[in-house]
Amino acid sequence: MENIIEINYNQTGKSKKTNEYGMREMQARAFEKRNSQYLLVKAPPASGKSRALMFIGLDKLINQGLRKVIVAVPERSIGSSFKNTDLKSYGFFENWKVDPRNNLTVGGDNSKVKSFVRFMESDDQVLICTHSTLRFAFEKIDDKAFDNCLLAIDEFHHVSADVNSRLGELLRSIIHNSSAHIVAMTGSYFRGDSVPILLPEDEELFDKVTYSYYEQLDGYEYLKGFGIGYHFYQGQYTSAINEVLDTNKKTIVHIPNVNSGESTKDKYDEVGKILDMIGEVEYQDDDTGIIYVKRHSDGKTLKIADLVDDQVGRENVVAYLRNIEALDDLDIIIALGMAKEGFDWPFCEHTLTVGYRGSLTEIVQIIGRCTRDSYNKTYAQFTNLIAMPDAKDEVVTYTVNTMLKAISASLLMEQVLTPDFKFKRRRNESEKSSTTGELFVKGLKEPSTENVKKIIENDINDLKAKIMQDSQVQKTFSGEVDPKVLNKVLIPKVIQKVYPNLSDEEIEEVRQHVVLDTVMKGAKSEVVGSKEFIRMADKFINIEDLDINLIDSINPFQKAFEVLSKELNSPVLKLIQETIDAKRINFDEDELVFIWPKV
């Protein structure tokens, strides 16, 4: 299997080093904005968001005069990230302390809401609870009770601007009816796959701190590289998984949801078949729930955690996973809905996911499981096992669409896993470009309004997500559509849909930056003599000759076509093309006028 994406990192150690206050690079960046009333922190898994919140929360209590800090997490297990922490020994002015009575993520569900209400009426300062407890407690207390308090929402992508989202409604109510401060934290670079997290007018209130995935991984000590690959199968995935499951690597296997097309509809049988493929089950430990399997190839005993079986013993398995310390404590995890968000197994080298995942946030979370820095690995891998279209298959259109969506998701991941560029319009020949600094581009329109500037600086990845998930755009992955039609017709259409208030001039400015950024992040840099060249699609270009017209002649999704061509045989490619052709791209009259000279 050849990877569609390969990224190398420089092991600078920067993201792990701490300053005189004991803060890592991301935490120090967030702490600089500690006085903001509303703060949105976007940073990848394992970058230290929990501790960043501790620093900010303590400053708000001690130096800014706030009364309380309330931390809401999506599930109980994540509450342990906010346990008592010694910060003073590393240079900070106070330790993070939580009274056991106020950690509502421990134990059963009895009287959690009562405990929350008691906390709000007491002089206690710090409380940890789940999103669910926060929602139910909110119904019992007035918005004004949150005056002069900090409400921190971890895994903020769970919030939604949808009118039916109770967490979203709660947040809007607190913003508009109290003097509360809010810190929102997320490891996802995409607001949501259809509904935004916040209404635009609410989002404008937030100061933003972004720490990129590239900064995080490039600043690691051990990790040198990361790859994203696809493997296509026909029939049932359980008969093909052995082709991509390397049992020498510490691996998390995510099997498909029982409602998905890839599922056999019997999740327990699927786990059984995977175990049989690996080896012979020797026994299951009564205390821990861990399954001991004697590997077929060499007789080595592997320790495997089954998180799919949701019977009584799963709590024991979860408890075992929480206390893993040694490399040999575990070899493989098989999971369905678990081992994603907030789950920590630094030794994991490979995440193998069966079937397409509709949520980009979920893909970010899954990838985050294998990209932790650890002494046992220099390379991490995400593999997606996807059904190959079959002409005899009744759901061939569904399979083709699923494949295109999966490939678009990995192209999006490449956009956040590679370094960011700074683009400027080339005004004279003496300006020198560099892929590690500024890139000068002939004919590039620079932002003419504050609105465009904000979109380019803060929302470009969200916009790319909308573009790549657009069904019309995905039809261009087969390589049959002229790049200029994609870049100058289809992409502006999506921009206009997402930002209906932009003028034509503003749309063009945003379009140029989106296309340019997408093309450059998929390009490879090569130095020949004293000159730097960029290889993009089938072109090899001197970095000083970058021109917006040249960029517009390149399909930014060329890689999608390349992966399809390499991994699939001719009959399957023909089938994909025919399926796409059956659903032609629709153009209005103005668009046809633009396209006509090319036909």
Swiss-Prot record:
Domain Helicase ATP-binding: 30-207
Chain ranges for the short sequence motif DEAH box as given in the UniProt record: 154-157
Gene3D superfamilies per record: P-loop containing nucleotide triphosphate hydrolases
Gene Ontology terms, MF aspect: ATP binding; helicase activity; hydrolase activity; nucleic acid binding
Keywords, in A-Z order: ATP-binding, Helicase, Hydrolase, Nucleotide-binding
Boundaries of every Helicase C-terminal domain copy: 236-408
SUPFAM superfamilies for the chain: P-loop containing nucleoside triphosphate hydrolases (SSF52540)
EC number of the protein: 3.6.4.-
Binding site for ATP: A43, P44, P45, A46, S47, G48, K49, S50
InterPro entries in the record: DEAD/DEAH_box_helicase_dom, Helicase_ATP-bd, P-loop_NTPase
Similarity comment text for this entry: Belongs to the helicase family.
Protein name per UniProt: Putative ATP-dependent helicase YeeB
